[in-house]
Amino acid sequence: MEFVWDERKRKSNIKKHGFDFIDAEQVFNGATFTIVDDRLNYHEDRFITLGMLEDVVVVIAHTEEEDIIRIISIRKATKNEQKIYFKGFSY
């Protein structure tokens, strides 16, 4: 997989959320939970992935096309999103 992003959006995300898009690959190499983001009509297929970045559950908004993942944002998961993530792996 190749990871791409808009550099201005990356810098904005670091300031706003404290997470760097460069670290997205680390999240996707671990255990993840992905759903389709159909909250709005984005004119493209968007996904929300929950995963671990070091010891923090994060939410990554992204698109996927062939072998390319375009990162839109990364932020710390809310308490509810953390529950969803951990519940998904506790059968």
Task: Kindly give the residue locations of the regions a language model identified.
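Ribonuclease/tRNase effector modules and their secretory precursors
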Residues: 1-91
